Amino acid sequence: MQNRTVAIIDDNQDSLKELEKILTMAGYTTILVDDILGAVDIVINNKPDVILMELKMPHKNGFALADAVNRVFETKKIPIIAMSNLFKDEFKWLMDFCGIKRWIKKPFLPLDVIWAVENEIEEDSQWEMERHSAGMEIMA
């Protein structure tokens, strides 16, 4: 696995540290973001491979933040994984609309986090290979 970066966006310092520990032990580089209002700029400047974010945060909820990330050309392809202790069926359409690819229910197991991140990176890499392959066919 090449070195991949995960941006973790959460207003809870304990959650940030726990997720940092899980992902660092799995070989990922992490960017910890507790500044919810500045999170979009941090994502734009760092372009992580995956974003892992809490949905319930003060000032800006995760849906609004995901939507803001997806409206920026440079970051709209970054997979977003939402975390929350509360998920309802009516959230599914909102998650799709905001570009959230996957969700993890809190409390989570470390393997749930690693599995979700690895699957998003794998799906993103597969999409890039298919896009590159299609481009090569067009050029031929």
Where are these regions (language model features)?
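Acidic catalytic/metal-coordinating carboxylates
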Residues: 34-38, 61-67
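Charged docking surfaces used in two-component/phosphorelay signaling
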Residues: 17-25
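CheY-like receiver
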Residues: 123-140
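Acidic, metal-coordinating helix/loop segments flanking the phosphotransfer/catalytic sites
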Residues: 32-50
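Alpha4 helix (beta4-alpha4-beta5 surface) of REC/receiver domains from two-component response regulators
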Residues: 64, 86-105, 111, 115-119
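The feature encodes the CheY-like receiver
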Residues: 16, 58
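Active-site residues of response regulator receiver
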Residues: 54
